[in-house]
Every structure is written in structure tokens, then in C-alpha cells.
Amino acid sequence: MKAVLYMVIPCYNEEEVLPVTSGLFLEELQLLIEKEKISEESRILFVNDGSKDRTWEIIEELARENPHFIGICQSRNRGHQNAVLAGLMEAKDVSDITISIDCDGQDDIATMEAMVDAYYDGAEVVYGVRSSRDTDTFFKRFTAQAFYKVLMRMGVETVYNHADYRLISARVLKEFAGFKEVKIGRASCRERV
């Protein structure tokens, strides 16, 4: 049986890039469906994180035009990681796997197929790892390196240069949702499409 994939894409003031990257995400989703890697029930879930521009209106238009696009609109800006978390929690009961990816198109969308293949080979979590940080500013590269060094000195095992680009199985998400140490819940949504 083919897995239902939900791409979880946090959006904050993305009206400039969303019309372009949404098409790229849809092309990859359709390619994976055509190759019979994933179910036709798979979706692209945009999480509007309180954008001040037309991001939500664009998501609504996309959802009206194509059933593979859906969206949730948070009541206010809650931050990037909370938007990702809201999308993952929204998808956990209706998908077999999720892939979180940023809306800006900087991650290699074509590697989704390899991530899905790794899932079929038994992986529950697949990290996207940056091969280069050339497009990052000096400040971002410096702070990222400092962050990893601090974590290593504290004895924390981490995946160096990993991104928010990752596949997570529904089984892992359901376990994660059960943790009570952190308030994990559904998004404070104003609207859904």
C-alpha cells in the first residue's frame, strides 16, 4: 500500500515566492504519485504563520484550484518552529509520512524521492543535511557553527548542518505528540482550507 505523504510548509510573508515554489512542490508531489511512490491522497499543507501580506489569500486560491493544496492559518505569528509543529500535528492522523520543508525553495525538492525510499526501507526519520552553506550570510554561518560547537561541548549528539527539511513517520509523530514536557497541541487556527 502506498503511503500518504503530507508536505508541511510553514509560510510567513511568502507572497513573493509562494506562486513559484507552490508549483515546484506540486510537480514533485505529482511525480511521486505517478511513480507510485505515494498515494493520490497525499497533500501539500501550507501553514500560514500570521503573515501580514497576501500569503493566506494565495494559499486559499491554490486550495480552490487544486485539491492537493490545503492550508491552515494560525491566528497570529507564533514563530517558524511552532508553525512547523502545527503542521506536523495537523498531519499526524491523516498521513503515513510528513516531509517538512521551507517555502523559499532553497532545499533540493528532488531529494524527496530518496527520503520516501528510505522510509520504505524502514527509516522512521530522514534528515535533510546541507552539503554547503554558501548561500547563507556570514552571520548565519558563524552562529550556526557556534551553535553546533556549544552543543557538542555539552555532550549533545546532533546531526551537523541538518535543516528543517526532514521526513517523519506518523508513528514517530504520534509518539512525539504524547510527550507532556512541552505543550504540544493543535494549531491555534483562524481558518482551514
What is each of the regions a protein language model found here?
Residues 3-9, 18, 25, 42-47, ...:
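Hydrophobic targeting segments
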Residues 14-35:
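Short, well-formed alpha-helical segments that are part of the catalytic scaffolds
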Residues 14-17, 51, 108:
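Donor nucleotide-sugar binding loop of glycosyltransferases
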Residues 28-39, 66, 91-96:
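Alpha-helix termini
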Residues 42-45, 56-85, 89-90:
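Conserved donor nucleotide-binding strand/loop of the catalytic core
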Residues 45-56, 105-106:
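A conserved acidic beta->alpha catalytic loop
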Residues 74-76, 80-90, 97-100, 109-184, ...:
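Acceptor/aglycone-binding surface of glycosyltransferases and processive sugar-polymer synthases
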